[in-house]
C-alpha cells in the first residue's frame, strides 16, 4: 500500500538539537529516526513511500538510498497540508499516513495496513494530554484534542490507513491554531466509512530530547552486536555492542551494552560506556571518561576525566577535560525541564543536559 511519511517539520520542542538538523534525522540506534519509520512501513506492506520534506530538506533527500519519493511542503502549515503536498505522488488508491518522528511496533503496524480504514490507537493513563479517540464499539467516531474529560483512554498515534476517497477530503480549513489538521480529515473519514481502531502494543512520539533517549532505549537492544571496528584485546565489551568500521576501542575500555559506537569514533583508553548509549560517527571519548545512557552526536568530543549521564549532546560539541553533568534529583522527584517557556515533567528520575551543536565547555565545568 502506498504510504506518506510526514517529515517536514523542524521540531522546535527538540531544540537546540534541531537548529541545524531536522528532527526526523536525529539518531536512533545508529540510524535516523525517520529511517526506522520507513523500514517498519515497508515491512508492514508499503509498496510506495512518499516522504514529505520541508525544513532542511536536503539532509533527508541526501540520506535515503532506498527507492522513495519526496514531496515538498513549502511552509509548515500542519499535517493535513503536508499530506496535501504529497497527493500528486499518489495513485487513486487507499493510502497510509505515518509520522516520521514516531516509533511504532511492527506487528501493530502490519495490522493497521491489513485493517484499513483504520487509525492507530494507544492506551495511556493521561489521555487529556493527547488527541483522544471517540469510539462506538469497534468503530472510531471522531477525535477530540486534549479534552478536560477524555471520552476514552485511547489516544491517536498519528498512524492512519485512509480510503482512496480521502485524497479528496484534504480541502479542510484551518484549525484554531492556524494549521490544516489531518485529524479533521480523520473526522470526515469516520463519517464516510467504518474506521477501526488498531491498538498499538508499543508506540513512542519522539518530540522532546528525553524521548530521544527513550527511543534509543527501545531500539538499541534490537541491534545485532556486529563489531567491525578495531577493538583492543584489553577492552571488555558486554551485551549488545555495535562497533562500526573505522571506530577504535582502546585498552582498558569497558562497554556495557546496549551501545552503538559509530564509524571512525574513538573511545578511551580506560573509558566506561554503559546503558543505552550512542557515540555517533567521528566522536571522541577520552581517557577515563564515563558516558551513561546518552546520545553523543556526530563529531562531538568529550575530554578526559569527564562524566556524561542521561544527556543528549548535539553535533560537534566539545566538552573540556573534567566536565561533569548532573543528572539526578536527590528528593526522588522526576526531573522537570523548560520547553518553549513551559515547565514540563520528563517523568524521568535521571536527566542531564541537552547541549546544542557547536557548544563548548572549559575544563572542570560542572
Regions found by a protein language model. Give the residues of each.
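Flexible, glycine/small-residue-enriched loop-and-beta-strand segment within the central core
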Residues: 218-220, 255-261, 267-361, 365
